[in-house]
Amino acid sequence: MEDSDVERRVTAKVAWRFVPFLVLCYFVAYLDRVNVGFAKLTMDADVGLTDTMFGFGAGVFFLAYFLLEVPSNLALDRVGARRWIARIMFSWGLISGAMAFIPTIAARTGVSGEHTFYILRVLLGFAEAGFFPGVIFFLTLWFPAAYRARIIGYFMAAIPLSSALGSPVSASLLGLDGALGFKGWQWLFVAEAAPALVLALVTYFYLTDRPPDARWLETEERDWLVDRLAVENKARDSVSPASVLRSLYDPRVLAASLIYFGVVAALYGVGFWLPSIVKGFGVSIALTGWITAIPYAVGFVGMILWGLSSDSSMERIGHLSIALAIAAIGIGASAALDDPLLKMVALTFGAFGVFASLPIFWTLPTAILSGATAAAGIAAINSIGNLSGYFGPFVIGWIKDATGSFAWGLAAVAACPAAALIIALALGHDRALEKAPDGAHRV
């Protein structure tokens, strides 16, 4: 049988086994991470939060995430994805559920509701550290380079998908206010944390760490995949403690981290505050859920189509740059517009750019690094980039308290993908990226 037939069969088998399940896991992870944006619509009075306090608490998750990201991903490489990802999911499920009991915890410990909120967000960041880059690293162990943009795109589609579907659900859960003596925002945290605990158990038994362990592949299929990935990895750095350390100081890793910083600032800066922005239009909480879903639905489509376009042309930097430009223009325009309809059109335009950039961006680190160096490098990029997950929400909340408007906060966030665009164009002149296996990462 020709190699092309084996290739199609193997990639299809691996994709169908892992991608839908990992999309579901990330769907739950992202929902648990950002559902606080909807909870804010009714929890502020119960917990005692101003907009600045909420922005700080929403963002402090990422400071904790930053501290443990690289150690967590190195642990994944050592103990295996199956065990480590299951541990991560179980931990974040417990802590996300505990968010529902902030008033009770505060009353029994004597800690204020504000500081209890901060502490739980920090613990959630510690718990979830390593999940996203761990899955990205896991996918590089199973898919040849030519398939990674679309596969990563499918996986990352869980971000807009979770918000597009989760926004109306979150708004509906807020409507359970008073049921069994719980507030609506408490139901929101409990209901959306439970799936993580279930999926943690399933993950432990379902994932396979590496291709040589894949008994569900035929011998011919397994051998082809192992050999193909070995050929690709041979062209990159050998794995050693020194090469892992070098990856953390590689200028390209730093550049990629700064690009991701700009993307994440837009993703979470707008994401955490979008329910509040929409609620400010004077609509009901239920309608807020449906309107909030629109930018994410468009972002979902953009992510899939843009990843396919990038793979079909084998071109990365151009696609990434266009997406970043769209993100900056859309979010920047939303800051200048007061009309609710026009503001939502601009935010939807910006969401397309933000989400379309993500799968393209994540092909770049694996063009540079492999093995444990990839685990460390990907984690470093993700953790440094995710620091803007603190910057975006906090700056918008602080400016909102100071000015009474979201306009200047949105303008500040729009500057981040604009800066990322400049760095991406500069990175495009790095000719080392042209030599990625099979031209899959040609820029």
Model-found features: residue ranges?
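A late C-terminal transmembrane helix in Major Facilitator Superfamily
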Residues: 370-405
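Conserved MFS/SLC helix-loop-helix module at the cytosolic interface between two early adjacent transmembrane helices
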Residues: 67-107
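Cytoplasmic helix-loop-helix junction between adjacent transmembrane helices
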Residues: 120-157
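C-terminal transmembrane helical hairpin of 12-TM major facilitator-type secondary transporters
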Residues: 314-364
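Glycine-rich segments within core transmembrane alpha-helices of 12-TM secondary carriers
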Residues: 152-174, 195-196, 382-392
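Helix-to-loop junctions at the C-terminal end of transmembrane segments
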Residues: 68-80, 302-315
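Extracytoplasmic gate region of multi-pass secondary transporters
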Residues: 36-37, 246-304, 358, 362, ...
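Cytoplasmic membrane-interface "Motif A"-like loop-to-helix N-cap segments
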Residues: 78-89, 311-324
